[in-house]
Amino acid sequence: MRLSKYYLPTLKEKPAHAKIISHQYSLRAGLIKQIASGIYTWLPLGLLVLKNIEDIIRDEMNKSGAIEALMPCVQPASLWRESGRYDDYGKEMLRIKDRHEEDMLFGPTHEEIATDLIRDVVKSYKDLPLCLYQIQWKFRDEVRPRYGVMRGREFLMKDAYSFDVDYEGALNSYNLMYKTYIKIFKRMGFTPIGVGADTGPIGGNLSHEFHILANTGESTLYYDNKFSELLESEDIESLKSIYAVADDMHDPETCPISQEQLNVSKGIEIGHIFYFGDKYSKPMKASVTSQDGKNVNIHMGSYGIGVSRLVGAIIEAFHDDKGIIWPEEVAPFRIGLINLQTKVTEAADKIYKALKSDEVLYDDTEGSVGVKFSRMDLIGLPWQIIVGKKAVSENIVEVKNRATGEVKEMQIEEAINHFSAK
């Protein structure tokens, strides 16, 4: 993509209302534009990051055997009354009426819709287990939206719903999603910490939050220092049983491990999984015939990942004082190609044409060298190919690793071959 043909409205100065790094850089790097409190337009560069995060999630969810669907944003209140949650949910739910004066709502979550989706079709234990997921926009009317996409009112979420005939099957589904989440977050460059959590308004009796470590996190995490070692082994039962909790669940007096063994860090929540048995299937009459001929309520779980929130979390975890440092799998473009002067345009064009255009953002603008370098560092593409005067005199370009800052000279053909091979 040629920058001269692209829409990338970057900002030189830090917006006064943006308090944390991810919010500042999201605005400055031209990822988002605020439309109202907690509501944003996703600009082209930010949308590419969102799509890359979606692709990772979709790939791992599909590998787990989950099946993608798409449920409506606007839901009838009747389903929430049927489950008993309509009056309990509170002011976070945006309630509306249609032209027929029917009560509707903009979905903050989709347990009721998911239960309704299968209850008239899934009737036998032979139809289970089943796991459906979607990637869909949601709305929660936060009292104080803040921190940009980290705590917005409108947000993109991956939510999945598992259906099983009994507790044993439901626990297998839960453990499978736990393992899938570990894989998803590791692909994004994170060290995810799964902590025991309160079930909140979703309900149920088993729940884990997934956090990534970041100094600006809202939660304080307490976890056994063996956690990282177990994470590499992906031993789910050990990961679930090892001590790892957030501040609201930590009691120093009853903590089962010593202070020497206890790590304390700030974290950002990026995912949450729940097992809630028949909390929804019972009132909504979603049941199946079991293998022994009995009619039993379906055991359910739900599994959420904040997709748009992940953009902010990634920036919080991967940045420096110059800008964002995108991990390669989520970067909007892999390479930033910088043309430093008019007389090297032919060489820069040659490189651009030789590489995949959807992986390269080619700065072919007439701005100053300083502006070009600053903008490319700000938007944080993993690699920069810098085409200066040596490209003409010696057939040499500079290749910069954004994460390490290391700059290496390469012959033009060598650089083309290096990035074409990956």
Swiss-Prot record:
What CDD domains does the database record attribute to this sequence? ProRS_anticodon_short, ProRS_core_prok
Say which enzyme class the record assigns: ligase
**Keyword Zinc attributed:** no
Keyword Cytoplasm carried by entry: yes
Q: Where in the cell is it found?
A: Cytoplasm
Whom does it interact with, and what assembly results? Homodimer.
Protein's name in the database: Proline--tRNA ligase
> From which organism does this entry originate?
Wolbachia pipientis wMel
Lineage runs:
Bacteria, Pseudomonadati, Pseudomonadota, Alphaproteobacteria, Rickettsiales
